[in-house]
Each structure stands twice: as structure tokens, then as C-alpha cells.
């Protein structure tokens, strides 16, 4: 049977499948046609995300049905050592008491003209975890 896969760009892909095909198989066919790796594909039908191990019949996908292809967003956790480095970089600053400019940790005077290059600086407050 024939089904359609619509991408977010509006492009429609036509696939030849069987109702016994798994979602994995469909994703592999999409990869063959479009070059998108299966682990980056999310298929949506009737508002539901389709799970890899299940078949088209499980979701009652029939001939000429339209699936929607969405790309998976990759993001996630920052490694703890990088998180500590970012925290150190963002918190070890001096703040001008007049114009609130952020300055490097060893600053003696503000770099801004509007406060007259003030020497009234304080350390940036530490945020609590």
C-alpha cells in the first residue's frame, strides 16, 4: 500500500509499505529516500508519536494515510566539569556600583564612560544552588 510522509518544510514523500511493516522499517525507507538517519526521525500520526517496535497496523494506518515527520532535537545535560567551569566564568566578575557593568575579576575601574570610570566596584553576588 502507499502512504505519504509530510515534512515540516511541506515536502511530501510517497512510500510503498505493508501494514505489517514496523515503524523502524518505515524510518529506514525514509532514510533511503531523504538521507535522514532514523534516530533523528519522529513520526506522528493522529497526534501520536509512533514507537519504533510497533507496526503500521497497530496504529490503524491504512492506504494513503499521511504521517508527519519531525526531526528530533538533540540537547541535554552539560558535563559536570563544564558546568563548574561555566559557573566559575560567569560568577567571577566585578560589578560597577554606579552603572552595573560586568567587569573582569581583577578590575580596579569601570570601563564605561557613563559612570565616569568609577572605582566603586563590588564582587558579583554568588547564586545559591
UniProtKB/Swiss-Prot annotation:
User: Does the keyword section mention Ribosomal protein?
Assistant: yes
* Ubiquitin-like domain sequence ranges: 1-76
In chain numbering, cross-link Glycyl lysine isopeptide (Lys-Gly) (interchain with G-Cter in ubiquitin) is at 48, 63
Q: Name one GO biological process term.
A: modification-dependent protein catabolic process
Q: Which Gene3D superfamilies match?
A: 4.10.1060.50, Phosphatidylinositol 3-kinase Catalytic Subunit, Chain A, domain 1 (3.10.20.90)
Q: Which InterPro entries match?
A: Ribosomal_eL40_dom, Ribosomal_eL40_sf, Ubiquitin-like_dom, Ubiquitin-like_domsf, Ubiquitin_CS, Ubiquitin_dom, Ubiquitin_ubiquitin-like
Further comment: Ubiquitin is generally synthesized as a polyubiquitin precursor with tandem head to tail repeats. Often, there are one to three additional amino acids after the last repeat, removed in the mature protein. Alternatively, ubiquitin extension protein is synthesized as a single copy of ubiquitin fused to a ribosomal protein (either eL40 or eS31) or to an ubiquitin-related protein (either RUB1 or RUB2). Following translation, extension protein is cleaved from ubiquitin.
Q: Spell out the protein name for this chain.
A: Ubiquitin-ribosomal protein eL40z fusion protein
> Upper taxonomic classification of the species?
Eukaryota, Viridiplantae, Streptophyta, Embryophyta, Tracheophyta
Gene that encodes it: Ub-CEP52-1
